[in-house]
Amino acid sequence: MATVEELYRSYGILADAKDDVGQHKSAYQVIIDGVKGGAKEKRLAAQFIPKFFKHFPDLSDSALNAQLDLCEDEDVSIRRQAIKELSQFATGENLPRVADILTQLLQSDDSAEFNLVNNALLSIFKMDAKGTLGGLFSQILQGEDIVRERAIKFLATKMKTLPEETLTKEVDDYIFSESKKVLYDVTGEEFVLFMKILSALKNLQTVSGRQQLVDLVSEQAGLHQTLNPADPDSVDRLLQCMRQAVPLFSKNVHSTKFVTYFCEQVLPILSTLTSPAESIDVQLEVLKLLAEMSSFCGDMDKLESNLNKLFDKLLEFMPLPPEEVENGDTAANEEPKLQFSYVECLLFSFHQLGRKLPDFLIAKVDAEKLKDFKIRLQYFARGLQVYIRQLRLALQGKSGDALKTEENKIKVVALKITNNINVLIKDLFHNPPSYKSTVTLSWKPVQRTPDSGQKRTSDETSSTSPPKKPIVGPKRDSRQIYNPPSGKYSASVGAFSYEQRGGFQGGRGRGWGGRGNRSRGRIY
């Protein structure tokens, strides 16, 4: 067992040898043996072993293993010192192994130790990004769940801090191909993180890159399968995937496949969908997603059939006027509930797809059904005007902080909803129906006009040509509820309340593929 004096003596021999350091193998072996000593010897060994490591390839395995022993020492200060120096072993063929080891060390619950591991990983990333990624993905695919989770989060948060020259096209391609392997079996939270990782890749900022991401989401969403409305996991999966897809669509990257699936598979069973969480109005979430996607729908094979499905669903949410009693009044308990939030989504989607078949209401819908629709439309429009007046009156004279109260914020959103519906209904009242108006969906931010002297942005304000957005996951907004005097509003209006939860309900391993839990231990 080497003593402190022997360690210093051996260090002196190696330091003084300069170009001939490789000839003093026995001195380096003494330093390696220092890991068997006490705390002082171990601390010195943790510093000395990496310093001369590159000069003794024959002892590389024993030197690295000795350093790893120190990384697992009971003394936290020794562990930290050993981890801090690990990146010095990342040369040549050793780099992927060191990356693998550092990835496993991410499971540390000591914050200082965890930060050292992160810094070491970033440091070897700059030496060899692809080799480092090999170690990370090895653990993501095969490691313990805690290691997998932290490795994914490392990629999602730290890669954006790397110098641009580190992430070459070859590295981007490697990340994409390895990520596709991981995505065969992920939880909902992992899927969202991987979309964040992939969306940040320079290679995928192009139209073809976005299309690749859309295809990836399509596979995850299971658009080739029939949706089981009774399975909350299946519904949850669809919602999460669609929320990741929406920011990717543009005039060049179409949502046709997704809109078709919603019209054919989801709308007919909308009322039977099982919500993945009590706080989620799953029908409204689905309709909002459909509305957002409809702006980017390309040529559709079964356009008339899908417009019919959308039209039928719209009719469900647009009630007929109540029958009048003998004195000409309407019984209060018979007055239909006007569900404005749902109707905004359905009308917007119908308006978008109707542009592609402008004679649908004239030539494709029979006379009786069209007459019924116009009666419903007129009744809805009358109720709409009442609420618009009430809302404007309630908000009249209010500005600044007064509009920031929760109640008034909800009323502002409600006014957006009713104004949108009003514009769309006016288009449909035209003879023939018009599809020229543009509105911004009530839960989408309105692009402000740039101040004079400021550089004008390239973003559009119309929902039919929405602003270009970075390819990132959706922001989480709080649900806003508006209860007008007569209680005819949908119970929920405003922004998406859907939360990205980790995993899914039920005992299905990782939720999307049943990885299951393994306890592998460290596999240095």
Curated annotation (Swiss-Prot):
GO terms for biological process: apoptotic process; negative regulation of apoptotic process. InterPro entries: API5, ARM-like, ARM-type_fold. May be an antiapoptotic factor. Residues 503-516 have a biased composition (Gly residues). SUPFAM superfamilies: ARM repeat. It is found in: Nucleus. GO terms for molecular function: RNA binding. Residues 440-524 are annotated as: Disordered. This is Apoptosis inhibitor 5-A.
